[in-house]
Amino acid sequence: MDLWQLLLTLAVVGSSNAFVGREAVTVTLNRANLSLQRVNASLETNSSGNPKFTKCRSPELETFSCHWTDEGHHGLKSTGFIQMFYTKRNSQEQNQEWKECPDYVSAGENSCYFNSSYTSIWKPYCVKLTSNGGKVDEKCFYVEEIVQPDPPTGLNWTLMNTSATAIYGDIQVRWKPPRSADVKKGWIMLDYELQIKQTNETQWKMMDPVTSTSVPLYSLRLDKEYEVRIRSRLQNSDKYGEFSEILYITLPQSSPFTCEEEFQFPWFLIMIFGIFGLTVMLLVVMFSKQQRIKMLILPPVPVPKIKGVDPDLLKEGKLEEVNTILAIHDNSKPQFYNDDSWVEFIELDIDDSDEKIEGSDTDRLLSSDHQKSLNILGAKDGDSGRTSCYEPDILEADFNANDGTSEDVQPDKLKEEADLLCLDEKNQNNSPCDAPPDPQQALVIPPEEEKPQPLLIGKTESTNQDAPNQISNPISLANMDFYAQVSDITPAGSVVLSPGQKNKAGLSQCEAHPEANFVKDNACFFKGDAKNPDVMTPHIEVKSHEEPSFKQEDPYITTESLTTAAEKSGPPEQSPSSEMALPDYTSIHIVQSPQGLILNAAALPLPDKEFLSSCGYVSTDQLNKIML
């Protein structure tokens, strides 16, 4: 029948004289489309030939109904062709009995209704469709899983307040639960979802589900019209029921004029202009402070230079000035080695006088016949001999100031200094022994005249008091010690040397028997007070024989002193029982302690070597010639 209607409609559309105008053609096409849809549905149903369940629904958790499709038997009121059976599954019953639908009419066509007498919760149901005794579809479910409440009813809204600009308003929407749901007694608990949109919009805005029957809506435009709809679901379920009827909301305007669009502050433009202004200011600051910013971002690399040295001197090549500047700094001074030609100075640390009161070697040496007070000129040099060596004039002035002697002694000193400068010729002509000294007996004083005096620096004994002891003890020279090492410093600041090898046998003397007259101001020594160097006035004793003398003003051993001493001492005949004479010591070997020094023995002069008659300090070449 439907097919014949479709063919008739197409025939009518094909005739151009039947309808006039575009509207008539549109209506005809719509009718033809509906007819084709019906024919297609009939063809699909008839082609499959099997009815199916469409849905099973419980509106209030007390009753439920199931619906199915049967287009092939449309219009037939007899139920003999399609039947629905149900059963309640029970794990204890193995053979379950299927029962036919209790009501085919109450829920509508092609449906089965189960009232409260046939409905049980917490139990599974299974339903099936049969056609002419054969099963065509089957479905199992729980009643609480198919709950889809009816739509809420009684929707209305209330205006709560409006904004000060009369542009926005707040409302509250209320509704009632579904009539079929027993919400008051608590048999069922529902959640409600509200959806809202403007009238001219197509997209609904969903609100969060609530359990109450009222929802506030804020900031609604007063010049707009809104649509609201609500649906419900069982709590903890995801199946919503049908939507309620649409509620139309039109907010009243407070002024007779049409509400215009709200004035929006131009934040975007302000941000653009602000960024532009900040950029301009930053560029201005960068250009004005370009050098300083460059120094902060890229600090300059420091130029390599020597502290205290002007780099212009290095560029100009003035090496003499650079060397002078480097010599001022201690860390730039060259180190002295043993083979260096520079003079090495000895620095002695003087201990407290309280630490040397008892048990010192000085008391032992000064208590016996070995006590010989040379009354040597003493002065403590605070710079370890630098001033006395390089500035002899200053030291002589200090000695004269501290000496306390009269100015009558100065001509004698100058005369002796002149004699010391050129002693080579005098000593060669006036030497009591013309033969060159024996290497083993050089620089040895005859034992009969005077015993060798230890280099003991004292300050109280005089030459007049020691003269009887020197004459009365002529044999003690053989047993006297040479002192080669500093062993102690007395509380008064005097230096005591340690004894060396003894000469046990007596030494023969020259025929002239010269007596070595040592001037007592030919050595520097340190007193107890390091700040006030004292100078002892020498007492020169006139001897009958010509004696080698040392320079009085110079506190250090010079070439002339060594040369004169070597030439004046004759080659005495060695006793058979005597030992080899000890040489003088000229250099430091080991520093054992701040007060202990071991000196290296210098080689005795050979017979064929001649001493240089140079004036001044001992140079390296002269010292090597003396030591050979």
Curated annotation (Swiss-Prot):
Show the stretches that span the lipid bilayer. Answer: 267-287
Q: Which residues lie on this side of the membrane: Cytoplasmic?
A: 288-628
Signal peptide location: 1-18
Please indicate the residue ranges that the annotation assigns to the motif WSXWS motif: 240-244
Q: Which domain of life is it from?
A: Eukaryota
Q: List the disulfide bonds.
A: C56-C66, C101-C112, C126-C140
> Where is the motif named UbE motif mapped on this chain?
340-349
Does the keyword Transferase feature in the UniProt annotation? no
Phosphoserine modified-residue sites: S341
Quaternary organization: On growth hormone (GH) binding, forms homodimers and binds JAK2 via a box 1-containing domain.
Q: Which PANTHER family match?
A: CYTOKINE RECEPTOR, INTERLEUKIN 5 RECEPTOR SUBUNIT ALPHA
Report the protein name in the record. Growth hormone receptor
Which species?
A: Cavia porcellus
